[in-house]
Amino acid sequence: MEETKQSLIASLPSAPRKPKSKVERVVRKTFKGTAHLSNLLPTGSVMSFQIMCPVLTHQGQCPTITSRWLTCFLVSLCAISCFLFSFTDSIRDPNGKVRYGLATWSGLLVMDGSITLTEEEKEKYKLKILDFIHAIMSMLVFFAVSMFDQNVTRCLFPVPSEETKEILTSLPFVIGVICGAFFLAFPTRRHGIGSPLTKE
């Protein structure tokens, strides 16, 4: 009985696809672009921050000046790693193994030096000005994420004024909107360390 149902379903003609309206295409493109936002921040940097922040800030208490300095150092170090990881990329070698490298002005410098790239591949992986803009925006997004963290804000601003509170709530939102719009308009083509490699 079940086999008969399956064969009947398989034999039904598929309904013709209705062409998508302009609004549907825009919405689809927006959602597709939003998927690229996951590449904004290296997961390792964010995870390191989330693990170490409560420890270094003593759950936001920061009892000593050393705690505050260590918190500033952690935020700066993670932001710098977001900047640097923006210049990493990956490629599949002829055996299908993923190789990571650093984008340079002359192409991709594969970290273990096991493969040499063709001239066409070198051109594809060259460092561009847009990579620097992505790196700076990645740092800004990380600073916005860290400003939303209650441990950081309580540590660095234990008794904030009304003006400081306003800045701490609105600035990360503004940074997120501007950087998000930029990344949707100009998505990164790099698949760095911690980012998934597509079949392209």
UniProtKB/Swiss-Prot annotation:
InterPro entries linked to this entry: DMP
Top-level taxon of origin: Eukaryota
Gene Ontology biological process terms in this record: abscission; dehiscence; endomembrane system organization
Membrane-spanning segments: 37-57, 69-89, 129-149, 167-187
Entry's Gene Ontology cellular component terms: endoplasmic reticulum; endoplasmic reticulum membrane
Expression across tissues: Expressed in leaves, stems, flowers, siliques and roots, especially in the vasculature.
Family: Belongs to the plant DMP1 protein family.
Function (record text): Involved in membrane remodeling.
Protein name from the UniProt record: Protein DMP7
Organism of derivation: Arabidopsis thaliana (Mouse-ear cress)
Taxonomic classification: Eukaryota, Viridiplantae, Streptophyta, Embryophyta, Tracheophyta
The gene coding this protein: DMP7
